[in-house]
Regions:
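PRPP-associated nucleotide enzymes
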Residues: 1-206
Length: 206
């Protein structure tokens, strides 16, 4: 169990030490992932940026992700959803989540231009559950020609870890639980990270 995100980020950065000196960029998923990414970027001496994806939820289950979407409309589904996509609920949910992703991208970055060519991209979050928000970013990253994609997170369920290994060059985790309920159970302190804190951290890398 980790004390908080800062401790988890420092411990994770030790596992990434061999990437120091490479042309690296840390891409963090807000908001908790930015605290982790800050520690990694400081340790490796590289830039920190954000990448936005939003969970798509089924009716009445706000915590359960069946997929995820990015500001440009890139979508990943955890299961075959083709028969449901024209239902009014999902049309509305997809539009809402895409708009939310666009708003957050504008707030934290100001634009959607990324220069990832020939870079080693370290994609990080404070924990990965189903992996929906990460898988959609991996799909998007593949179109942007990075040299290498490393997924790094303090905690990833063993089953998700095996799936991630198929879609990235390297996956680094400190904990690989076989039983997993929520990311928060692996932290003593898991307060919500404010948008102001995210903006403050990112300002140091501009």
């Amino acid at each position: 169990m980790f004390t908080d995100r800062n401790e988890a980020g420092k411990l994770l950065s030790e596992k990434l030490a061999d990437l120091k000196g490479e042309n690296c960029l840390v891409l963090a998923i807000p908001r908790g992932g930015v605290v982790i990414g800050n520690q990694i970027a400081l340790s490796l001496g590289c830039k920190l940026d954000v990448v936005i994806s939003k969970k798509i939820n089924p009716p009445n289950h706000p915590e359960y992700a069946i997929g995820a979407i990015m500001p440009d409309g890139t979508v990943h589904w955890n299961q075959d959803m083709s028969q449901y996509l024209e239902h009014a609920y999902f049309v509305n949910e997809i539009n809402e989540k895409k708009n939310e992703a666009q708003r957050q991208l504008e707030q934290f970055r100001g634009n959607s231009r990324y220069d990832l060519k020939d870079k080693t991209v370290i994609l990080t979050d404070d924990g990965i559950a189903t992996g929906a928000t990460v898988f959609v970013i991996l799909k998007w990253l593949a179109k942007n020609n990075p040299k290498k994609i490393v997924v790094a997170s303090p905690v990833i369920p063993a089953s998700t870890y095996e799936q991630l290994k198929k879609t990235s060059d390297q996956v680094i985790a400190l904990l690989l639980p076989t039983e997993f309920y929520a990311v928060s159970e692996f932290y003593k302190k898991f307060d919500q990270v404010s948008e102001k804190e995210v903006e403050s951290i990112l300002k140091n890398f501009r």
